[in-house]
A protein has these predicted regions:
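Glycine-rich phosphate-binding loop signature in dinucleotide/nucleotide-binding domains
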Residues: 23-27, 89, 108-110
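Generic beta-strand structural signal
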Residues: 33, 88-89, 156-158
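Short acidic, glycine/proline-enriched helix-loop-strand junctions
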Residues: 41-55, 133-136
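Helix-adjacent hinge/juxtasegments
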Residues: 50-99
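Conserved beta-sheet core of the metallophosphoesterase superfamily
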Residues: 54, 93-95, 99-168
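A short acidic, often aromatic-flanked loop/helix-cap motif at beta-alpha or helix-coil junctions
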Residues: 85-87, 146, 171-173
Length: 173
């Protein structure tokens, strides 16, 4: 299963749409959003891709009720999880949380194969040694909106566990 991981879209519909569009062309089957959507309507353009979008909120969250209602609309692709989400997809245990320090702590537990975060706008792919003797991947896609650093997202394959940080088409480099 191929994934598109984004975070910190900060209402930038055009760059969010560009990232998800490119990821779908590359074969993405699902989108994970690690928060700071701001206005829930910023996710509406993602409907066109027909991919499930799992989203949590961050510290820049607009109307959570509107987000909940958007997810309840008929044929909605939005799955709103609140402040964090534990998912099982492609045979992997995934956790989405906005803050990197929580993500690091969760990765250390060994309870998750992949822990994803955002918030600091710094893209990173790290392997974390867990307390159970294995390892977990800690993924931070940076900011898809290009607020501060370049606009970026992560494209990955859950089967091969290969992930790459990609520049968003049309975003600053």
């Amino acid at each position: 299963m191929k994934i598109c991981l984004v975070s910190d879209s900060h209402d930038n519909r055009s760059l969010l749409t560009a990232a998800v569009g490119e990821a779908k062309e590359l074969g993405a089957q699902v989108v994970w959003h690690c928060g700071d959507v701001v206005a829930p309507t910023a996710l509406r353009p993602l409907q066109q891709f027909g991919l499930p979008v799992h989203v949590i909120h961050g510290n820049n969250m607009g109307d959570t009720y509107a987000m909940f209602m958007l997810a309840q609309e008929p044929n909605s692709v939005i799955f709103y999880h609140g402040q964090d989400a534990g998912l099982e997809q492609g045979g992997k245990r995934i956790f989405l949380v906005h803050y990197p320090h929580y993500a690091h702590a969760l990765a250390l537990t060994g309870d998750w194969d992949i822990v994803c975060c955002g918030h600091d706008h710094r893209p990173a792919i790290k392997t974390i040694d867990t307390v159970k003797g294995g390892n977990a991947l800690l993924l931070n896609p940076g900011t898809v909106a290009g607020v501060g650093p370049r606009a970026s997202y992560i494209f990955g394959d859950l089967e091969t566990m290969e992930f790459e940080i990609r520049d968003v088409p049309g975003g600053k480099k």
